[in-house]
Amino acid sequence: MLFSSPEARSLLANRQRRTPCVLLLDTSWSMEGEKIRRLNAGLRTFREDILRNPMAAQSVELCVISFGPVTVQSEFALVRELAPLQLEADGVTPLRQALELAMLKVTERKHTYREHGISYYRPWIFLLTDGEPTDDDGVFSSSYRQLLQPLQLAAAEKKFTLFTIGIDVSAQGRKVLNALSAPFGGRCLDLANLKFEEMFLWLSGSLSRVSQSAPGEAVQLVNPRVGDDLYDGWVL
């Protein structure tokens, strides 16, 4: 039956327009120690902040994917329905494979919304990494270039919006992230001093703003300040 699964029943019970977001999080070995601890703390802060906003709590849906190795930590669900996560650092940085999976999850979720008559805002993919894309041996891989044309098409057709965040990345890593976000009119934002909680507060505030906007309305996002870097001009 169409509404036999818990997911279907949840969609039937709550007809609120959805604000879907994929958190695409680097958990490779280089995130060990303080970085992964701050990332987990930031995720807790994000969850708490979304739940403080009644409208966002009914609208914002998260899918969490970690990479190193690529793992779906949680499928799309309202934030209150997600179990708290405790991520661990391990493995290399298969960024291309992780981003491909995120794009697939967005496509599948939009299909589910349409199947159940749920309206939705343009999905977000929020990519956060501290390194460069690698192959299985941990060597730099340029295979991310295979995604540039699909990303350009996705941006032109407004299929989703991609934001890229670099955690003290190298010049080469920043070049990769800039290339990935360029089709969406953005660039890599540098996350200085491991300010994960501030970054996730910006994200929750921005998603909350989107969830309260009118269909078709251009949403001017809050300009995040991370370290000394003010990233302005994000418009959805």
Regions found by a protein language model. Name each.
Residues 1-22, 28-37, 51, 110-121:
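Acidic, polar low-complexity linker/tail segments
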Residues 25-28, 39, 64, 102, ...:
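DG-centered beta-turn motif at the end of beta-strands
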Residues 39-52:
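An active-site-proximal "capping" alpha-helix that borders the catalytic cofactor pocket
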Residues 50-57, 107-118, 151-157:
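Alpha-helix termini
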Residues 58-86, 174-180:
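Short beta-strand-loop
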Residues 83-121, 161-175, 197-202:
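Von Willebrand factor
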Residues 131-183:
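VWA/integrin I-like adhesion module and closely mimicked acidic/polar interface patches used
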Residues 161-225, 235:
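Von Willebrand factor A/integrin I-like adhesion domains
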